[in-house]
Amino acid sequence: MSPEFPPFLSPCMNITNMLHKCVAWTIEYYSEDVRLEIAAMPFGIRAAYVRLTEMLQEFGLDLRMPHSRAMGGGLFELRPRGKEGIARVFYCTMVGRRIVVLHSFIKKTQETPKRELDVARKRQKEVCGS
């Protein structure tokens, strides 16, 4: 007779995998337009973004420089870089280990343009209520 496993625990799943799946962060997008803007970024930047989001799902708020940076007031930025340039992707977090991607842009200057930051903060207020 084979042992019965609870539906969430298959025989091939070890405890480490189970714990990892339980604590992983989920990533959502403010809108379909935000997701499409990121999908339209140059290949190298997009590849870096995918790698960073995988790290973000695993480490959440523990992801730090040079990959992510706190912008203050609960707003954060991912910092994807490719041979084509540098992008910034703003996000906030919500209860239930949820990350909401708010806005993205390709950097052309050393400083983050105020307009880009304002868009992210406005969306953060709408979504995260902070």
For each predicted feature, which ranges?
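Basic, Lys/Arg-enriched alpha-helical interface segments
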Residues: 2-86, 95-98, 106-130
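Portal/gating segments that form or line small-molecule/metal binding sites
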Residues: 89
